[in-house]
Every structure is written in C-alpha cells, then in structure tokens.
Amino acid sequence: MFGGLVRPKSRGRIRLTGSNPLDPLQIEPHHLSHPNDLKAAIACVQLCREIGNSDALRPFTKREVMPGNLKGAALEDFIRDSVVTYHHQTCTAKMGCDSMSVVDGHLKVYGIANLRIADASIMPRVTTGNTMAPCVIIGERAGEILKADHKL
C-alpha cells in the first residue's frame, strides 16, 4: 500500500542556469516545504496503517514493512527522507492573470510575441487524476485558437 498527497500545497520551481538552451535546468522540488503537507503525509501513513491492520486485510498481511513502528519525530524524518512524487510535473507556466501567470487565455506567453504554450505546464493546479485528459483538452483548445487566429 502506498499513500500520497493528491493536492500538495508545497511548490517547487525550475530555473534557467544560463542563456544557452542546452544549459542544465536548476530544479528545486521543495517537497514538504508547506507544513500542511507533512501533516497530510503523516495522516496518509496513519490511514494506510488502519487499512492494513483492518479485519478485512489481516489474513493477507503479516506486518508493516515501512515505516515500521515509527512515531513522532522519527516518523517525520522517515517521511522527509523517503518522499517521492508520482505526479506528472505540471503547472510550471500557469494560465491566468495574476503575477505568477505565464500565459493568457489564448495560450500566449506574456511579454513574448508569437509564442504560445499548450501543454500541462499551463494548468494552474495539479489535477487529482491523470493529466492526459486535461492535456487533450488543452491541445484541442490550442487547435481551435490557432485556426481562429489564422482564419483557417
């Protein structure tokens, strides 16, 4: 059993390290940087323990493998040391009109002429499900926008 946060509040960032497009990116995931995320991760472990120790699953489980019998600060350390993400990386160039937005409602990048973005990076928040369906919608909408703009 594996529990995880579907809507983490922590936010990472990706930065350019130079002007050359081949320069490596600086990726700062900032997992668990928001205090609510650690609380939610602890709740995930507790829920997995309850389910795993339930009467329905007792015939199929011998013991908890990880994190074992950890509690308190030791459990928090385990969570911090073993945190992973299973989400597709999204929301790095969100659509909107606030100061953190990168593209407008027509997928145009603010301040850069003739550049649009049409992928999962424009989503303002991570979806609770797989990202494929929203990406299909974004692509379909991009096609409609381009056809209208170019009178096709």
Give each language-model segment a name.
Residues 1-134, 142-152:
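FAD-dependent oxidoreductase catalytic-site/capping-region signature
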